[in-house]
Amino acid sequence: MTERIVLAYSGGLDTSVAIGWIGEATGAEVIAVAVDVGQGGESLETIRQRALGCGAVEAYVADARDEFANEYAMPTLKANALYQGHYPLVSAISRPVIVKHLVKAAREFGATTVAHGCTGKGNDQVRFEVGIQTLGPDLKCIAPVRDLALTRDKAIAFAEEKGLPIETTKKNPYSIDQNVWGRAVETGYLEDIWNAPTKDIYDYTATPEFPPAPDEVIISFQAGVPVAIDGVKVTPLQAIQELNRRAGAQGVGRIDVVEDRLVGIKSREIYEAPGAMALITAHKHLEDITIEREQARFKATVGQRWAELVYDGQWFSPLKRSLDAFIEDTQQYVSGDIRMVLHGGQAVVNGRRSETSLYDFDLATYDTGDTFDQSMARGFIELWGMSSKVASGRDLRVAGQ
């Protein structure tokens, strides 16, 4: 029986060429797998037909938009996950769902190997292969760009020689990855980290310098998940899409950062994540009134570690699973409404309410009706500062000897 290889297929030049390239290099039949995570553009049927036209013996396509929003974006939101304080894990959280469908397709079509289009310098090769090793430990992995010397120039020449049904061009200097959670742009002139990004970089966001009138929005949450916008019920996918539209129109969610890649290099990235950043901002403000102080402090540490694990391709790891359990427990009271104004690149919260809020007006007010017993403060301060006072006395005593 001829060996079969499952290929993560985007519909673009590199993976279209990879179908024939892999076949010629290995003698195997190629099954193309395309997963819709809200990246937009062409329909899955168009992509499926292109894969078959480029030589795939089968084409597996999956509309995973709701799955991605529910099972991958929402855990990211609950964790308030921002890698190195900036990046909302746009690409990192899409790789596990693609891996899941790659392994599923491999089982369905009897493939023994999974192929992806990643280079040897990026994070995604790790995310794909660690995920595949975890979900399908018997499966082998290959990367045509990395392992079979498939360069961009060779891809264009191969496509033209074979007459493949795909546009061949070098005109776009950027590497772009996008889904409903956001958009990532790198390479080209951006590799000089002194160069400012030009307007053509952006697609999800309008120029924040010339915004339309301020847009006030009320986002309702239930156990950490957005369930309504301005009183209209929404699914997680619909919430992200609506805020992509409204926050994007105000230029919210533009991120220009140099980050530490898993492979040991620093890389300049431009991200657009209007919906993600608006939701994370709103969610964090709701947590501020519904999560107890010590729990909130520790959750911030957990969220940072969670983001690092996911960035580093450890979505399916035991530690990440344990952190998920902690984060999920913190969300039981994160229900209520957040009012925010979207304008000029900013998402500013100006109101919050919750039936499970820990904010007590009578304790917090400085006006008549204050129920806070200030007489307790003196004793509390004495006890709170006791250890520092004792240590200071020791320091003075030793210094005087």
Swiss-Prot record:
Gene name, Swiss-Prot/TrEMBL: argG
InterPro entries found in the cross-reference section: Arginosuc_syn_C, Arginosuc_syn_N, Arginosuc_synth, Arginosuc_synth_CS, Arginosuc_synth_type_1_subfam, AS_cat/multimer_dom_body, Rossmann-like_a/b/a_fold
Cellular compartments per GO CC: cytoplasm
Family from the record: Belongs to the argininosuccinate synthase family. Type 1 subfamily.
Record: residues binding ATP: A8, Y9, S10, G11, G12, L13, D14, T15, S16, G117
Location within or outside the cell: Cytoplasm
Molecular function GO terms recorded: argininosuccinate synthase activity; ATP binding
UniProt entry tagged with the keyword Amino-acid biosynthesis: yes
EC number from the UniProt entry: 6.3.4.5
Binding-site residues, L-aspartate: T119, N123, D124
Coiled-coil positions: none
Residue numbers binding L-citrulline: Y87, N123, R127, S175, E259, Y271
Binding partners and assembly: Homotetramer.
Keyword Amino-acid biosynthesis (UniProt): yes
Main location: cytoplasm
Xref: Pfam families: Arginosuc_syn_C, Arginosuc_synth
TM helices/strands, residue ranges: none
Protein name per UniProt: Argininosuccinate synthase
Keyword list, A-Z: Amino-acid biosynthesis, Arginine biosynthesis, ATP-binding, Cytoplasm, Ligase, Nucleotide-binding
GO biological process per UniProt: argininosuccinate metabolic process; L-arginine biosynthetic process; urea cycle
